[in-house]
Structure formats: structure tokens, C-alpha cells
Amino acid sequence: MLVSRIPCALVVLTLPLPLAAQQAGGARETAEEFVAKLGGRSGAVTIRDGLATLQVPETFRYIGPDAARRLLTEGWGNPADASEGVLGMLYPADVSPLDSGSWAVVISYDEDGYVDDADAESIDYAKLLKQMQDAAASEDAARRKAGYGTVRLVGWAAPPRYSRETHKLYWAKELDFSGEPEHTLNYNVRVLGRQGVLVLNAVASMPALPQIEESMQAVIGFVDFNEGHRYADYVAGTDKKAAYGIAGLVAGAMAAKAGFFKLLWVGILAFKKLIIAGVAAAAIGARRLFSRQKPAAPPASA
């Protein structure tokens, strides 16, 4: 789930109290006790056996894989298999992750290989958006047949931006789920490395965009691969190379989200607390498409 793969998408619900705070013996723990046991911390945090380091400021809290799984399942009511591959979570230090207005970032690792960024400056993001919108629309029939509502990709809430200096990519999408009064924000961050990509995702309602964008920009700044795993450490001809570039990375994230939402239960967005973690199998097809078909149109202004 934000995963070392095959990744799965996660849906995180905001609930006033942890679902499984009522334990087998009948004893209950308070929300404060539940959160305290998660062990949220700031400072330098190393993830996945030295793969990367997060320099977590005092304004955030990080929880590790086990605590993240507990929060996702017991606290927010996700099925147990939904947290497979989670490397941890980040949430604002000044808000309990169990509060109705809280949000969090789920972290995973996609070990598809080194992503060549040669196409970064030639991508027409307006054209790519249209392709993603068409792909999302094509899924609607399957969603309706399965008894779920439709999802429309409205547009970029923040257009994709990639830094060749830091090898970090971010973008945000505005989504319209049928029957929901507010549009949904899906904020994506990808950090490119030697053998894969760190995946950080947050989902909230569109009115939260200013807050989420400011916070995610901070997150982008304190997440980095460690020496030996960095983008610059790639050894051509020896290390695995991903079958897609930057365009496929962006399009693949939409495919993962669209494919997953076919399986969602009705009314989930009423909780306004979704976090998509990782890239699901549905993303693979989109990535393969973009590995064969590079955008030829001139780049759109960001």
C-alpha cells in the first residue's frame, strides 16, 4: 500500500473512535490510549532496512508498519489485507488521527525498477489528462454493473511537476464520485530511486487542498533515498529498469485508483477519509502502454 508489491490500494475511513478499541476480552481503550500505543514520533526515521530516510519535523508524526496496519484496520475499519506492504504513515502532529478532520499519508515502495525520466519535459499533460479521463470513464460501466457509483476525473488539482535535480514528482487530481456533494482530492508524491519508487498518497475533500498542498510540499522535502539506493546510483545494464517513464508513472496511478474503486462499498466517501496506497495491478497495463507509446505533443504550460 503504499507497498513493495504487488501493491494494493487502501481505503482509510475517519471514525470518531477506533473500531477495534473494543478488544476480545470486552475491555475498551480510549481514543487517546489507542493513539498513544501507535508510538508516533518525529526525527530521523529509516524505512525498509535502510532504503530511505525521513527527517520528520515536529509538525508531523510517523508511525511504522505495524502501527500503521493497526490504525488502518482497527482504527479506520479497513480489511486486514488492505494494509499489505505499508511502510508507515505520516499525520499532522496537532490533530489526532482519529479525529473527524484528520488526514494522513500512506507510504509504500514500488520496486518496478529504475524509472527513466527522459520523457519528463516532452509530456503534454493536457493530452495525458484526457487519456486518463477516458480511461476512468471506460471503467464506469463495470462499476455500475458491480453496483457501485461512478468516478469522474475532473482535472488536475495541481498539475504534475518533476524536478530533475531531486528526482521527485508530485501532482494532484480532482475526482467526482457520483452521489457525493464534494469533490475528492487525491494528492500523489513519487520519489524516484535506483530500483524503484517511493509512493506517498493522501486523499481528502477538495476544500482541504490548500492545507494538504502545503503539508505535502513539506513532506516532499524530508523524504529521500539513502546512499546506494538513490536515483544517481543506478547502474545501466545491471540494475532493473522500469517499463515506463514519467507519463506512465502518472497514468498508472490513476489506473490503480480507478481499478480499485470498482470494489468499493457504497457510501464510503461519506467518511471523507480515503488514502490510496501504492499502485495496484490495474496500473501495470497503463504503464506498459506508456512504455511503448511516448507522448509526442509539445508540453503544456504548467
Each model region followed by its residue ranges:
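Sec-dependent signal peptide recognition
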Residues: 2-9, 273-276
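Bacterial N-terminal signal peptides
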Residues: 7-18
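Conserved polar/disulfide-associated segments of primarily extracytoplasmic proteins
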Residues: 23-53, 65-185, 228, 245-251, ...
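Short aromatic-glycine motifs in intrinsically disordered, low-complexity regions
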Residues: 42-55, 207-218
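Active-site-proximal beta-strand/loop segments in catalytic clefts of secreted hydrolases
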Residues: 57, 110, 174, 201-204
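Short conserved aromatic/hydrophobic patches within beta-strands of well-structured domains
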Residues: 58-64, 220-224
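Extracytoplasmic/lumenal ectodomains and periplasmic regions of secretory and membrane proteins
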Residues: 176-242
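C-terminal single-pass membrane-anchor helix
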Residues: 242-299
